Amino acid sequence: MSKYDSHLKCSFCGKSQEQVRKLIAGPGVYICDECVELCNEILDEELMEPPSPVAPVEERPNKRRSGQNKTTWEQIPKPREIKKHLDDYVIGQNEAKKVLSVAVYNHYKRLKDIQTQKAGGGSPEDSIELQKSNILLIGPTGSGKTLLAQTLAKILDVPFAVADATTLTEAGYVGEDVENILLRLLQVADLDVEEAQRGIIYIDEIDKIARKSENTSITRDVSGEGVQQALLKMLEGTIANVPPQGGRKHPYQDCIQIDTSNILFICGGAFVGLDKVIDQRLGKKSMGFIQPGDGQASKDKVAAGLLKQMTPDDLVKFGMIPEFVGRIPILAALSPLDEEALIAILTQPRNALVKQYQKLLKMDNVQLEFKSDAVLAIAQEAYRRKTGARALRGIVEELMLDVMYELPSRKDVKRCLITREMVEKRSTAELLVHPSSLPSQESA
């Protein structure tokens, strides 16, 4: 046996114990002092480097900071003007629009007051501190919750980020930390912390983090009540440490500090079953409202009426913890969309679906028209699917597939007229065989 077989060696560089000053033993492995020193140098270099190859905020071109697109306090629209803008893009939901318009206007008045106080322009009488009021939107899927929040962000020209509450977990478990919500907002603001701190965050599917029962469980609910607890300080206002690369935080990485005190949080969720909780509190039986022969429209109307009588206690009964409910004082209920509203969504808004497809076909020099009974048939099918306005695009996309596939290669089709029969068949292939030349009356 070689004399070197009895010598211990570094598991990393292979040097023997005689070749180094110190050899540190671990469970089945060894590391020498030279490798330890090399590891320290590598770590020091990485920690000295900036978290990402991004220039300082002052040196980066930023259209918001340039003042070209940044909303000044004097330019903030009044509540009536905000609602008018919302009406251009969102059909119905007038009560929710009013609630949002007033809440957003008051939020930015609060920011203006803070700015005035910092500049020393306020009088002693103006030293009253205005508290933040976050918003909770409750309504069925496809009723316009996310669209309302997105439209608000466009009106006010502030950073806007959307987060999904179902991906969040309590710290220490597999999933996303709640701080990753702030990272999305920071990225939208081009890493401008000051700009991000006056932005809007919409947290969707917030009802999915409700605890499973009202009674405290001995098992840990890491994606339910645990997430609600983690969100408390962020909603109220705190200095949060955000990892610039995302993922989990660890002690050796540099974090960006963001003050959430002035960030407006809008939470949204379907809260399926909340109407039953309210009905139970009111002491009324559903049978008293809905007769066996009533259709889905009657049931939706009753559910919408119950949601308008919602109280914070009902949300606690549903599974939201009292501390969380207390930090979202503004509640707005959205009504289910009926057939009439779905027809309006198809044709009236500035970005209406019919207008979008008309523009797409116009690029191929084809005039697209929908007969009124075809629009009605699309709305009826979307209503049956019970996914609100989201169903409309799927139906129209399926309907227009054949035409949109062939039209770019066809020169003989100059006009397409969509009829109810085509909607029921889910195909417009016959237009390619017999290009439509019907009169255009009753078309959308």
Swiss-Prot record:
Domain of life according to the entry: Bacteria
Keywords per UniProt: ATP-binding, Chaperone, Metal-binding, Nucleotide-binding, Zinc
Binding residues annotated for Zn(2+), in chain numbering: 10, 13, 32, 35
Matches recorded under InterPro entries: AAA+_ATPase, ATP-dep_Clp_protease_ClpX, ATPase_AAA_core, Clp_ATPase_C, Clp_protease_ATP-bd_su_ClpX, ClpX_bact, P-loop_NTPase, Znf_CppX_C4
ClpX-type ZB domain segment(s): 1-51
GO CC terms of this entry: HslUV protease complex
SMART domains: AAA, ClpB_D2-small, zf-C4_ClpX
GO biological process terms on file: cell division; proteolysis involved in protein catabolic process
Binding site for ATP: 140-147
Gene Ontology molecular function terms on file: ATP binding; ATP hydrolysis activity; ATP-dependent protein folding chaperone; protein dimerization activity; unfolded protein binding; zinc ion binding
Database matches in Pfam families: AAA_2, ClpB_D2-small, zf-C4_ClpX
Disordered, as annotated region: 50-73
CDD domains: RecA-like_ClpX
Family stated for the protein in its record: Belongs to the ClpX chaperone family.
Subunit-structure text: Component of the ClpX-ClpP complex. Forms a hexameric ring that, in the presence of ATP, binds to fourteen ClpP subunits assembled into a disk-like structure with a central cavity, resembling the structure of eukaryotic proteasomes.
Known function: ATP-dependent specificity component of the Clp protease. It directs the protease to specific substrates. Can perform chaperone functions in the absence of ClpP.
Protein's recorded name: ATP-dependent Clp protease ATP-binding subunit ClpX
UniProt gene name: clpX
